[in-house]
């Protein structure tokens, strides 16, 4: 039975408005009085329950795009040229902070010390989480640790330094680690959730500082390594390995699997709490997500060698390129022989539902959930594998990584699917040219242990694909230029049949696996639709998709010649401050570099 988080909507009525000066001085007096509330453990729990709605919905995972997955309409952050300074909103909202600080001001009224310290830990966890999200998005922000009155001069104060805010975040998350209950719960914050959040925060801050030239990166990376190792040693969590397809099943399970999942967002179809993971992937008129070719290429062979070292890898067709690859590839996208959960029918990629042909199946459950808002599998917010990855990356970026460190982190993750571990010395002796190339990899890694850093990034990209991490991974690594590169799909060698303008070819995506070798999967054609029998699906070139070299090549998604993308290195690593907020502070709140908002103070 799931334990549902019940949000106290009535207790926070009136707080759902954006804008610094509105949000921070509001309290729903019609609902409750702070001077008479917060007396019991139950009241502390009830009030803090609402903080959980800060967490992202499932759509932030299965709907992730960036450079890993290409959707029908790219987000403005990827296109770059269309980004503008908003008048209001844009992530500059402070309602949750007001609630958290209000709670912390009055929670002392509860005489149950153990309960109070636990729920104070919950509140400080969420304040750390709130500010971490703000720092990622805006950089320096004003720090508030109290609920403000409407005439408080701090409402118009400038930003505080990044160091002050990060030190305050560390203080909050350390308190949460020390005082939150350590009993594992899928849908509530515990000591272990706080440790996982600290690991995430410290890795972000340490690598952001390192690659953006800000002092102090070593301190945060060391903190990340320390707390991650403590989690590995002390926590009750481990990597889920049961079944034939444990990686797929981890995300398709209706109830989050507690062996690995530290915290999940609870979905329940019977209670009307649903999402659209299946619909997003299977519908022909919705997101049409497809994995980018460069990410497909980054999956290793089953023996641990690089796919991109294979002769002719660039022109391999779908069936051949999918053979003997890291099993996570065909547990993330449709592969040859793919069958839906609870089905024995072999299916091929549906190009009408995928921009690249590499159709996403991560988070996808059985066909009964394919309708709009038909999915209700839990969404994972924190899991053990992320902490293991954080540990390995922090140690690698510090230059203190050992093979033993990889044994207790990356190896455990790869053991799930039978993949060999990273060999640190081999990786450093021969860094992957594909991951070094600016077109397909990371241009800013220059450390002596460059090879193993790249391999850990490969592992992170594959393991955490479609879990909402990729955009800010690119930000912290200072690799925004990735968004300017072409987004490509499957390769097709050409149309060899027919003549003139009416040419076509047929492609068996499953090589007869379906049991009907007389019926191939698709026919691609130009001009008039050919009279070819036993074809499951026809696609007209130029309408259904476009290839890089006319009648052959890779599928092109969002052609950069027609839809140019530009990443501004001096501007785009931070979001702009809304103009209304700057005006309310008479310019004390400065704009982020490179964003011209037309205000002159």
Question: What residue ranges belong to the model's regions?
Answer:
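Sec-dependent bacterial lipoprotein signal peptides
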Residues: 1-18
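An aromatic- and glycine-enriched ligand-binding surface/loop that stacks and positions planar moieties
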Residues: 16, 21-75, 166, 170, ...
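Long, intrinsically disordered, low-complexity segments
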Residues: 20-21, 93-94, 162, 168, ...
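Conserved, well-structured interaction surfaces
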Residues: 39-49, 53-57, 73-138, 154-167, ...
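Extended amphipathic alpha-helical segments enriched in small hydrophobics
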Residues: 127-128, 199, 378-424
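Short coil/turn linking the two alpha-helices of tandem helical-hairpin repeats
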Residues: 135-142, 184, 204-213, 397-400
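Flexible, polar/acidic helix-loop-strand segments at domain edges
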Residues: 314-384, 592-601
């Amino acid at each position: 039975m799931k334990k549902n988080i019940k949000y106290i909507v009535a207790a926070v009525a009136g707080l759902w408005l954006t804008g610094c000066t509105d949000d921070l001085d509001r309290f729903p007096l019609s609902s409750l009085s702070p001077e008479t509330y917060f007396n019991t453990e139950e009241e502390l729990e009830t009030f803090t329950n609402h903080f959980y709605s800060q967490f992202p919905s499932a759509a932030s995972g299965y709907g992730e795009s960036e450079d890993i997955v290409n959707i029908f309409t790219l987000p403005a952050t990827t296109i770059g040229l269309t980004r503008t300074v908003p008048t209001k909103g844009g992530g500059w909202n402070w309602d949750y902070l007001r609630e958290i600080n209000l709670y912390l001001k009055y929670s002392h009224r509860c005489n149950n010390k153990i309960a109070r310290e636990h729920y104070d830990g919950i509140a400080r966890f969420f304040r750390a989480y709130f500010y971490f999200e703000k720092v990622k998005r805006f950089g320096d922000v004003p720090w508030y640790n109290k609920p403000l009155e409407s005439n408080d001069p701090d409402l118009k104060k400038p930003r505080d330094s990044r160091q002050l805010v990060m030190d305050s975040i560390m203080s909050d998350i350390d308190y949460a680690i020390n005082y939150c209950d350590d009993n594992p719960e899928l849908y509530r914050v515990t000591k272990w959730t706080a440790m996982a959040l600290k690991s995430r925060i410290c890795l972000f801050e340490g690598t952001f500082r390192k690659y953006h030239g800000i002092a102090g990166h070593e301190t945060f990376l060391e903190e990340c390594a320390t707390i991650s190792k403590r989690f590995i040693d002390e926590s009750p969590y481990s990597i889920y390995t049961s079944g034939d397809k444990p990686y797929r099943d981890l995300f398709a399970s209706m109830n989050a699997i507690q062996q690995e999942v530290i915290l999940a967002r609870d979905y329940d179809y019977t209670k009307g709490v649903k999402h659209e993971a299946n619909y997003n992937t299977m519908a022909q008129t919705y997101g049409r997500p497809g994995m980018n070719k460069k990410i497909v290429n980054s999956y290793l062979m089953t023996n641990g060698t690089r796919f991109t070292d294979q002769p002719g890898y660039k022109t391999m067709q779908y069936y051949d390129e999918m053979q003997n690859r890291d099993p996570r590839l065909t547990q993330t996208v449709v592969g040859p022989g793919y069958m839906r959960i609870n089905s024995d029918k072999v299916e091929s990629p549906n190009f009408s539902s995928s921009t690249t042909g590499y159709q996403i199946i991560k988070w996808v459950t059985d066909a009964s959930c394919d309708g709009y808002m038909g999915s209700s599998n839990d969404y994972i917010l924190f899991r053990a594998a992320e902490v293991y990855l954080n540990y390995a990356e922090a140690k690698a970026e510090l230059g203190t990584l050992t093979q033993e460190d990889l044994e207790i982190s990356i190896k455990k993750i790869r053991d799930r699917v039978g993949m060999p571990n990273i060999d640190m010395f081999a990786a450093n002796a021969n860094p992957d040219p594909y991951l070094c190339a600016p077109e397909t990899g990371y241009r800013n890694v220059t450390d002596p242990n460059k090879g193993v850093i790249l391999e850990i990034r490969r592992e992170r990209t594959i393991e955490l694909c479609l879990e909402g991490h990729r955009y800010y991974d690119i930000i912290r690594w200072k690799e925004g230029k990735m968004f300017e590169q072409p987004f490509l799909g499957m390769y097709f060698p050409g149309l060899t049949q027919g003549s003139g303008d009416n040419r076509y070819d047929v492609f068996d995506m499953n090589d007869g696996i379906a049991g009907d070798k007389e019926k191939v999967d698709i026919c691609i054609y130009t001009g008039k639709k050919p009279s070819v029998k036993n074809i499951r699906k026809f696609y007209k070139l130029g309408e259904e998709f476009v290839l890089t070299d006319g009648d052959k090549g890779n599928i092109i998604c969002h052609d950069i010649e027609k839809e140019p993308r530009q990443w501004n290195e001096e501007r785009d690593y931070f979001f702009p401050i809304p103009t209304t907020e700057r005006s309310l502070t008479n310019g004390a709140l400065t704009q982020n570099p490179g964003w011209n908002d037309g205000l002159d103070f």
